Amino acid sequence: MKNKIKNKIKNPFLQFFKNESSSGIVLMFCAIIAIIIANSNFSSMYNNIIHTYITIGYKDFSLSMSILHWINDGLMAIFFLVVGMEIKREIVFGELKSFKKTILPVSAAIGGMVVPAIIYALFNFNQPTIIGWGIPMATDIAFALGILSLVGKKAPKGIIIFLTALAIVDDLGAIIVIAIFYTSEISWIALILGLIIFLAIILANKLNVKNKWLYIIFGIALWICFLKSGVHETIAGVLLGMGLPIGKNMEEFRTSILYRFEHVLTPLSSFIIMPIFALANSGITIDINSLSAAIMNPVSLGIIFGLFIGKQIGIFGASYILVKLKIAKLPSKVTKRHLYGASVLGGIGFTMSLFVSSLSFTEESALSMAKISIIIASILSAAFGAAIFKIIKFKNEERV
């Protein structure tokens, strides 16, 4: 009976891994396509399309943004809604429920955010580009799990769960950073209205309201309020996800609003929204000049060293110390080699790093440098991480 309950709790994690690992492969393909187009004769058409303005609504009740902004500010709100639901699910029923389970991935995620941010800040100290310190903090779970699924087919489930939990905590950290540090001038009226709507979502949850359309309407209204408030509108997606009804046990969870939304939106986010985001944001011109410029550019150096080196030091270092001090223990059948391989894969920033870079820089040259370096660092992390998992013999090795 105990094992049955345990498996029920683990199943959402393993299903999530299946979706995200498959999505990572699609994401890689879309990023490559975008880079090829941006470096071909179709580059002008590509840029014209993503910068074409689309207006939704009528007169005073309308929103007008470029296709790129509709993707980054609109579609990505759905991606963040899925992230919010995942975080809530894992806090209530999953690997983030108890301190014992949480301490290792949470500490690893914090280490994996702090060290890269410090490295970036050292390269860009006392320069305007220091605003990009949040870029190397992120881990792209789809890419990381995609690589792991390709080269680590015999990897223990514990390392999959560890990497997934770490990435979820990492996403939560990125959300907090975006909300606090990447916010423009605040419109307090819009923000207060948004918070009132969020309280209404919480109240509907407490009253056990199960009408999905009510939550959809609340979610759209919340997004509009945050769009007008100056706080990045994707935060509305997170708040909606955290506020949805989830149930008190696994049986109630299976019929909850959150479960129904997650069931529909997770594949939509993984296989449509994130690939569209990759197509719209990965189209950068790469040539000898841009690559040589990236070698000496403080933005590029901060991001590359932050993601490729900082993530390894932060994730593996924090985990190793906790295990050595016996504050935490490694998951079943997971060794220090698995842990190090996962730490390297944590340096695949991509989606969230690209997203934060678009918030950090308005100047095209700095943004291009950031995008090039994110791709370089992600390729290095993916290749090195894949090599580690490829050569590991998955046996019962001595724990750290």
From Swiss-Prot:
GO terms for molecular function: sodium:proton antiporter activity. The keyword Membrane applies. It is a multi-pass membrane protein. GO terms for biological process: regulation of pH. Gene3D superfamilies: Na+/H+ antiporter like domain. Its main location: membrane. It is found in: Cell membrane. The chain crosses the membrane at residues 25-45, 67-87, 103-123, 130-150, 159-179, 184-204, 213-233, 264-284, 303-323, 339-359, 372-392. GO terms for cellular component: plasma membrane. It catalyses: Na(+)(in) + 2 H(+)(out) = Na(+)(out) + 2 H(+)(in). Keywords: Antiport, Cell membrane, Ion transport, Membrane, Sodium, Sodium transport, Transmembrane, Transmembrane helix, Transport. InterPro entries: Na/H_antiporter_dom_sf, NhaA. Disulfide bonds: none annotated. Na(+)/H(+) antiporter that extrudes sodium in exchange for external protons. Belongs to the NhaA Na(+)/H(+) (TC 2.A.33) antiporter family. This is Na(+)/H(+) antiporter NhaA 1. It comes from Clostridium beijerinckii (strain ATCC 51743 / NCIMB 8052).
